[in-house]
């Protein structure tokens, strides 16, 4: 069954042919509007991959419900977010390796690293502006991109705290309940409440004190079924390189 429509309104880092032009517009505005109108008529929300200010503007002007990634916003873009009650899905994980890894590790070209920095900074600035303007933000990690795995989503929460400057509590809320609300299932899951699905994880240490506690999961409860001490395959090179950006930690953030 279809749950959501996703558009690729812009390109990204890997298909940009020159420095300074990541997120080139790939869909005409009238095409975006036609898809959104049809999807909404059928009861579906529309998300859009967007990595340039022009792409964000085209998406929001033509009915997109959530922006995946984002780009540095101006006042007009902030207004469009609010006018459309749109969400922002912040995804620092896919941009970080291209922006911050040594190119001998990432195998990125000089152009890809340059544009990776533009996208990484744009995602950060979009998230900060959205939070400052009470625009709802959720988290994603764009799994399937290089250096992104299925088993360590906790890193996205950590990056959100480290690079956007939110509290640990806000990062947890953004990744759970707010994300469930965006997906249209906030009445079913996303928080521990009577009447909702028993979906939660248990960790030995408290992620409110240090989000890296989420790395070691002792128990998963999914729709009431228990999975004790879950095990999964990992990629050592991925862990080694990504851990370099998760080891420098200041004092625990306030529990607000």
Predicted regions and their residues:
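Divalent metal-coordination and catalytic microenvironments
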Residues: 1, 5, 39, 67, ...
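Active-site core of metal-dependent hydrolases
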Residues: 8-125, 138, 144, 165, ...
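His/Asp/Glu-enriched, well-ordered alpha-helical/loop segment
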Residues: 41, 45, 106-111, 120-206
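Short alpha-helical
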Residues: 53-54, 155, 209
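C-terminal cap of metal-dependent C-N hydrolases
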Residues: 175-177, 194-240
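Conserved small/polar residues in nucleotide/adenosyl-binding loops
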Residues: 249-256
């Amino acid at each position: 069954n279809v749950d959501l429509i996703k558009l690729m309104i812009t390109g990204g880092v890997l298909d940009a042919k020159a420095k300074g032009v990541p997120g080139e517009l790939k869909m005409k505005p009238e095409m975006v509007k036609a898809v959104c109108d049809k999807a909404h008529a059928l009861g579906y929300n529309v998300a859009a991959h967007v990595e340039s200010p022009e792409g964000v503007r085209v998406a929001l002007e033509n009915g997109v419900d959530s922006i995946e990634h984002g780009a540095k916003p101006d006042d007009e873009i902030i207004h469009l977010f609010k006018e459309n009650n749109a969400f922002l899905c912040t995804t620092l994980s896919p941009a970080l390796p291209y922006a911050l890894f040594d190119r001998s590790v990432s195998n990125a070209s000089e152009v890809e690293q340059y544009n990776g920095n533009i996208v990484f900074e744009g995602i950060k600035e979009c998230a900060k502006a959205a939070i400052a303007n009470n625009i709802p933000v959720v988290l994603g990690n764009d799994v399937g991109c290089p250096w992104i795995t299925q088993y360590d989503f906790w890193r996205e929460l950590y990056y959100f705290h480290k690079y956007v400057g939110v509290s640990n509590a806000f990062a947890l809320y953004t990744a759970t309940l707010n994300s469930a609300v965006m997906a249209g299932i906030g009445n079913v899951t996303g928080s521990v409440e009577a009447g909702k699905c028993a979906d939660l994880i248990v960790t030995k240490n408290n992620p409110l004190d240090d989000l890296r506690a989420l790395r070691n999961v002792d128990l998963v409860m999914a729709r009431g079924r228990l999975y004790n001490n879950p095990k999964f395959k990992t990629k050592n090179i991925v862990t080694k390189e990504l851990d370099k950006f998760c080891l420098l930690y200041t004092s625990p953030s306030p529990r607000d």
